[in-house]
Amino acid sequence: MSFRMNRRRFMQSTSSALAVGALSSVAGRASAQLPGELRVMVGGGDWGKANIEAYVKPFEAETGIKVQTITDDILLAQMELMAQTKNATVDVVVIGIGDIGAAVRKELVEKIDYSIYKKDELDGISAAFKHHYAIASSVYSFNMVYNTKAYPPNKPRPTSWSEFWDTEKFPGLRVMRSGDSGEGPWEEALLADGVPADKLYPLDIDRVFASLDKIKPHVRKWWAAGSEIQQILHDGAADLAHSFDGRAQLLIDQGAPVEINRNQAKLTFDYWVISKGSPNAENAQKFLEFATRAKNQAKFSQLFSLGPSNLNAFKLIPDDIARKLASHPDYKANSIPRNAQWYSEVGTDGLTNQQRFAERWKEWSL
């Protein structure tokens, strides 16, 4: 999500030397690890505070394990350096679903020990959120969002991506997510072109861009950062938008004339992972199990508007808050989980599918 991913992507676009320097900074602040300790990337700002309140403090109280929180973003380049030098200075890291494939291929992460999870907790976590080497920390989505001044509830408005693409029936200024990172409106373009939701993968890259050709003249801006789409929605500079649900929800909570359409939402999520060679791997496994319990995720989601990966958490979240979250059970039937495995697959050209989309976007957007 924008709170983390935009900053991460910016940093990944800089030199590897910067990444190494950042890791050295983390390591320099860290003393030698001891039994009963753990270093966890929690992130900064309100997200980091929510991670500390919902997970870190109660974990310390329950286990007696002392957690050192890391507010810096930890990049794949840093994780690779830790693995190469056999010096894992951060035990638990949050990464995006687009990074898990590379992390596994490069042997940067440990396997998750699901044997320590209680059955009822595991049953609450859908298969899409469980990976051999990672487990989803939180869930968010890309949605169609209305400017209710242009499209009030009593006026016909698009409810599917095919209707969003229908600019004659539903005129107005549109804004959509840029594909510069390889994470663009690919699934939405195929849905607009008539591909059934359960037949999206493998994505047909030529068909995606043929569909985008049709909507391109009607898109006022292709936004890259969450702050951009939030400002656009705040200013009323678009009638229809392709947006993070969380950015739109923040404005709704502030009384802005914005409404989220949950139909055909694209679900995506971040992963908790354990750094390869972590000297505190056992404690890290305990932390991940703790951080995916329904009770603790329910607390987190009430502090920060990200959906829980353990759907049992919704039994503990007040309904008015629960319905603001992308992973709410009522939205499941009409949502499309992003296929992390497919995006991370490497082709004969040595590129992942995500990288291939990023390259194609650069050519197409010129």
Regions found by a protein language model. Name each.
Residues 275-338:
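Mature extracytoplasmic/periplasmic domains
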Residues 140, 206-215, 252-278, 322:
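Periplasmic-binding protein-like
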Residues 334-366:
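Conserved C-terminal helix/tail region of periplasmic/extracytoplasmic solute-binding proteins
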Residues 45-52, 88-90, 94-220, 224-234:
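Extracytoplasmic ligand-binding site segments that recognize negatively charged/polar headgroups
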Residues 100-102, 234, 240-257:
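A ligand-binding cleft/hinge motif common to bilobed small-molecule-binding domains
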Residues 1-21:
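N-terminal secretory signal peptides and thylakoid transit peptides that target proteins
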Residues 34-101:
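Early extracytoplasmic/lumenal segment of secretory-pathway proteins
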Residues 103-111, 128-131, 250-262, 326:
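Ligand-binding "clamshell"
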